[in-house]
Amino acid sequence: MIIVTPRYTIIEDGAINKIEEILKKLNLKNPLVITGKNTKKYCRFFYDIVYYDEILNNLEIELKKYTAYDCVIGIGGGRSIDTGKYLAYKLGIPFISVPTTASNDGIASPIVSIRQPSFMVDAPIAIIADTEIIKKSPRRLLSAGMGDIVSNITAVLDWKLAYKEKGEKYSESSAIFSKTIAKELISYVLNSDLSEYHNKLVKALVGSGIAIAIANSSRPASGSEHLFSHALDKLKEEYNLNINSLHGEQCGIGTIMMSYLHEKENKKLSGLHEKIKMSLKKVDAPTTAKELGFDEDIIIEALTMAHKIRNRWTILRDGLSREEARKLAEETGVI
């Protein structure tokens, strides 16, 4: 297996001004930029630009329109980055990630989530994260990023469980890397004034994405908490719910509950879910169904169907009954 990780990673104030320098180092001369209408202002150069929604509205794109380019640069939030990764993968050319916020580990991972189920592509060849820009992004997006990082804790616990109970392939190095990233950010959040939170968060999200690339699987960063989040997404669509909850917010609440389930089976983990909850509260991320915008019944239904979302063995095993789901949500304070 060939492990592809970024050749260049720049995380600093003013990093966006180094795009041309990185292009030269990579011997890339004709990039196509994918961005959004709100982030076009950061494209301060004379490259061709396409808005991400033009691609998303037609995923079966005519690739011959873009064959003259030798790389794709995604500048913006999750949709710009994911769309850029997808297009670069389809074209067979490198992708450079230039995030303008830090709401999930998609900024560095080889995973695209523009449709479900998500799928693996090539990891970015370079990541250029301008912390000056990211610091000014909406606070809510940065809070959601914390939710995506804490999910590494339960993702790794689930992965190890699948290894023990189902003989699933397991990478100790990738698991330790992913878990350590999450624990260090939690420790920083709980023991600081958060003055460097945006900087620490970006580095954690980049590390999480690299852990996925090393494992060649989303396992180090996606477990039962992500199944719960995807179940919520499915119910939002099924019931036509006008709820604008973010992926990281949903994963954060999922992590509170799933870590509690792991605690019940392993006394060494005692207090884990409370620690995770406190870290989420510290960055103003939601920790209850009400704060997330969901009725109790939707949370319970999502918990009962989460194990069916994809073929992935987790602490949910063969599923929770409605009674078990309600008890879990109540005991963790989610409802």
From Swiss-Prot:
Binding-site list for substrate: 105, 148, 230
Location of the protein in the cell: Cytoplasm
InterPro entries, alphabetized: G1P_dehydrogenase_arc, G1PDH, Glycerol_DH
GO cellular component: cytoplasm
Pathway where it operates: Membrane lipid metabolism; glycerophospholipid metabolism
Pfam family, one: Fe-ADH_2
Chain residues that bind Zn(2+): 148, 226, 247
Keyword Lipid biosynthesis appears in the UniProt entry: yes
Catalytic reaction(s) noted: sn-glycerol 1-phosphate + NAD(+) = dihydroxyacetone phosphate + NADH + H(+); sn-glycerol 1-phosphate + NADP(+) = dihydroxyacetone phosphate + NADPH + H(+)
Cofactor mode of binding and number, as noted: Binds 1 zinc ion per subunit.
Top-level taxon in the UniProt lineage: Archaea
Record key words, sorted: Cytoplasm, Lipid biosynthesis, Lipid metabolism, Metal-binding, NAD, NADP, Oxidoreductase, Phospholipid biosynthesis, Phospholipid metabolism, Zinc
Chain positions recorded as NAD(+) binding sites: 78-82, 100-103, 109
UniProt KW Cytoplasm keyword: yes
GO molecular function: glycerol-1-phosphate dehydrogenase (NAD+) activity; glycerol-1-phosphate dehydrogenase (NADP+) activity; metal ion binding
GO BP annotation list: glycerophospholipid metabolic process; phospholipid biosynthetic process
Primary localisation category: cytoplasm
Cofactor: Zn(2+)
EC number: 1.1.1.261
Record function comment: Catalyzes the NAD(P)H-dependent reduction of dihydroxyacetonephosphate (DHAP or glycerone phosphate) to glycerol 1-phosphate (G1P). The G1P thus generated is used as the glycerophosphate backbone of phospholipids in the cellular membranes of Archaea.
Family to which this protein belongs: Belongs to the glycerol-1-phosphate dehydrogenase family.
PANTHER family with a match to the protein in the record: GLYCEROL DEHYDROGENASE (PTHR43616), GLYCEROL DEHYDROGENASE 1 (PTHR43616:SF5)
Name this protein carries in UniProt: Glycerol-1-phosphate dehydrogenase [NAD(P)+]
Organism: Methanocaldococcus jannaschii (strain ATCC 43067 / DSM 2661 / JAL-1 / JCM 10045 / NBRC 100440) (Methanococcus jannaschii)
